[in-house]
Design a protein with these regions (language model features):
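Extreme N-terminal starter segment of soluble prokaryotic enzymes
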Residues: 1-5
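Short polar catalytic/cofactor-binding loops
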Residues: 9-12
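Divalent-cation-assisted or electrostatically stabilized phosphate/pyrophosphate-binding catalytic cores
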Residues: 17
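Structural signature of beta-strand start/N-cap positions in the alpha/beta core
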Residues: 27, 42, 73-75
């Protein structure tokens, strides 16, 4: 069976994602350091929170380079998806750079409603 690594980037939804996977019959291992990604066949990077603290925690735990070097499928959820890009307007922070581009703040305008995302 392929090992699924669930990366702990300090996001509030780690437990929820793990529970959802368990309900689907998928066993996931929570990873808190770069060594935990060595034998992973799939990676999920969940997250609810802010980009700057999440990237700081990934750096502190030695996860940035292993995530960048990963050759297996990687799914980013919410903040995790934002962290896959080169940078983010939220905290003006450099991210993982796995996807080209910058996560930008949605701009409202006349007749254009912007959903509340927590940092607008």
């Amino acid at each position: 069976m392929t090992t699924l690594a669930l990366v702990d980037a300090g996001g509030a939804n780690l437990g929820s994602v793990r529970y959802a996977l368990e309900r689907l019959g998928v066993e996931a291992r929570i990873v808190r350091d770069g060594d935990g990604l060595c034998d992973a066949g799939r990676i999920i990077l969940p997250g609810v929170g802010a980009a700057a603290p999440a990237m700081a925690l990934l750096r502190e735990r030695g996860l940035v380079e292993p995530l960048r070097a990963a050759t297996v499928p990687l799914l980013g959820i919410c903040l995790g998806m934002q962290l896959l890009f080169e940078s983010s307007d939220e905290g003006d922070v450099a991210c993982l750079g796995l996807l080209p581009g910058r996560v930008r703040k949605l701009r409202g305008g006349p007749g254009l409603r912007v959903p509340h995302m927590g940092w607008n």
